Amino acid sequence: MSKNTSDLSSHTPMMQQYWRLKNQHPDQLMFYRMGDFYEIFYEDAKKAAKLLDITLTARGQSAGQSIPMCGIPYHSLEGYLVKLVKLGESVVICEQIGDPATSKGPVERQVVRIITPGTVSDEALLDERRDNLIAAVLGDERLFGLSVLDITSGNFSVLEIKGWENLLAELERINPVELLIPDDWPKDLPAEKRRGTKRRAPWDFERDSALKSLCQQFSVQDLKGFGCETLTLAIGAAGCLLGYAKETQRTALPHLRSLRHERLDDTVVLDGASRRNLELDTNLAGGRDNTLQSVVDRCQTAMGSRLLTRWLNRPLRDLTVLQARQTSITCLLDGYRFEKLQPQLKEIGDIERILARIGLRNARPRDLARLRDALGALPQLQVAMTELDTPHLQQLAVTAGTYPELAALLEKAIIDNPPAIIRDGGVLKTGYDSELDELQSLSENAGQFLIDLEAREKARTGLANLKVGYNRVHGYFIELPSKQAESAPIDYQRRQTLKGAERFITPELKAFEDKALSAKSRALAREKMLYEALLEDLISQLAPLQDTAAALAELDVLSNLAERALNLDLNCPRFVSEPCMRIVQGRHPVVEQVLTTPFVANDLSLDDDTRMLVITGPNMGGKSTYMRQTALIVLLAHIGSFVPAASCELSLVDRIFTRIGSSDDLAGGRSTFMVEMSETANILHNATERSLVLMDEVGRGTSTFDGLSLAWAAAERLAHLRAYTLFATHYFELTVLPESEPLVTNVHLNATEHNERIVFLHHVLPGPASQSYGLAVAQLAGVPNDVITRAREHLSRLETTALPHETVVASPTKATSKPAAPHQSDMFASLPHPVLDELAKLDLDGLTPRKALEMLYALQVRI
């Protein structure tokens, strides 16, 4: 592109104007308004044509070269923007602001909007059920400042995080569509691998200027009131975000009213692997089906669904908040009160995002119509909320409030079914503004005026052949036949002479003409001005309206959780101070919904006497389901929800870790085993005695001996850490752990064989499993029968020839032993060796020392 911009004087005047604007936005697609089209030029055109599947053509020449070009109709803009934003592209909208009729040279143009994935607010460009977040990060490997903004709601937060590992986990949680990092950071950092990462000038993150702009935004002298005045790095990141938002929106941001200081210590932390494994809101295939959210989300509003997603992705450790939510759900269940609220909440709609668009001054007429309907529904909702008698619900009712004056204003202003955009008018009701009514009447009723005028003039003049008409050249006129022209009244002024007729105009008709000819454009301008004024009236009340939206979203979530508790048979968990995790008849909330047979519920008990369960049993026996359901029950408890269990008693946890499943990281150059060990290392470094740890088949990605050794050592470390641990394994040798680790207990998932086929019973029972049923599972999977038969032969030989011994692997503190399990050969058993056979036959009592030494030398050579 540089070759086209090296000398602007060589370009045509229009392309000079284009390049002056384009050079300010080199990395973004520019849509350049020309008449009824947005034109796209040069490299932008080539890229856009490919992404949008539109025709690439050429437009004349400039600077001696043809100009690659493609274009789209201006009225189709939104559809194309949707495609580009979903592809992660940013688009600059350049509009004509000058009047082509009066412009000398190219019509004046300027950039009016910049659409980026993280700063879009248009309804068509957003997923209504998910937050659309943009983040900025500043710092080094030891400490990072992170700021997160949702421009579609006004939520703006900061936090500081120690180390890359925790930063990447937090980025995985919030999943921003754009991430801003300083341009002076080294290349190929972990954060830069994320899609949507953009580098910004280092001075955009400068702390002092950031502090100044943030204080100006919130109309405060300092940030002490937000509790984040000492977060130097996070303030720098927040300043960068605020500047970026203003740059893209080209307007003030009144809906950004505060800065929330978040702390990781206040939450239950889940790393990226754990979030993926538990499938909270995205399944392992990248979809939304069969996720926890798909089961627990029946919210009536989109803003309620988004809030529930935030809760699921950020479980709390604040017992006061959790118990307030539990009490609220109990109240809503009492007498099925939630059933009265939910239909009313459905009438509210997504006012959170509507208010953001009002703040950005790009709200559309239908946004205001929906806000009108929402405010109109508030009084009836308040009636339904009078029965709610918990302090938290009562506070939500007070915050929700009512807005009778604002509702009346919108009812008076906006027609029942307004058009999508204000561009062509037709939005405001008759009676809202007398001047607008007059202008619209002139424009719409000109024909009737002319009919009435003609009748009056005929009566006044007595000239029966008088006609009133209009043409584009001479405007409005009164026409008389030539023979009657001499009888025209004195106030008739001659306008045009025709063959056989004369045309006149009167002062009254002239006054009407002046009004009528400009009435339509003046009416449209007046309506747009009134619409902007209406937005300003709404902006003046934005703060309480946003509080109302937040209260209604939470009420929606709590009502939803009450409905789910009733229909999914969920019960209220009890938080206790002593360390424990006791679940009676726990169920997996997602698996239970997709099964066509009844789900087999199971108990779990972890406390000061038992901190680890070693779980054995066949593949498909339910080990992973049992582990995951425990994590989901604990997570639901920590958002204040009821849980899928007959009863649940637990203490607060600080983290949930999962090491489940196997997959490689081709992009990162890591094998399946490397991924497994990285996740294991993260757990061993960061788990505490208040963490819940799920470990599934650790060590299976390498050789038997290496894998077993690593699994054994990892289990010992977790036992010493006293973390709440569920350790599923096929290494039966690990079932001896309780003999050396008093906090470890064996359990297994049972199964049985019937008519040579395996039947999974899915019950969790005490003690280790007696069989692995590996061949039976292989048969179920469709492995050919001859392969199964041959495998049975190999298994029989291995079981009969494996070296019998009692001692397996000694722990660092104590040698352990266990009796051989039926049909399960020891993983450390080796096949017979001739040297071992001879050693077994030696008569040690009959050997002299010299003979014994000679025998050892001979045997050593043969090993």
Swiss-Prot record:
Bridged cysteine pairs (disulfide): none
Presence of keyword DNA damage: yes
One GO-annotated biological process of the protein: mismatch repair
Matching Pfam families: MutS_I, MutS_II, MutS_III, MutS_IV, MutS_V
Keywords: ATP-binding, DNA damage, DNA repair, DNA-binding, Nucleotide-binding
Domain of life: Bacteria
Binding site for ATP: G617, P618, N619, M620, G621, G622, K623, S624
Family: Belongs to the DNA mismatch repair MutS family.
PANTHER family, per the entry: DNA MISMATCH REPAIR PROTEIN MSH1, MITOCHONDRIAL, DNA MISMATCH REPAIR PROTEIN MUTS FAMILY MEMBER
Role this protein plays: This protein is involved in the repair of mismatches in DNA. It is possible that it carries out the mismatch recognition step. This protein has a weak ATPase activity.
Name recorded for this polypeptide: DNA mismatch repair protein MutS
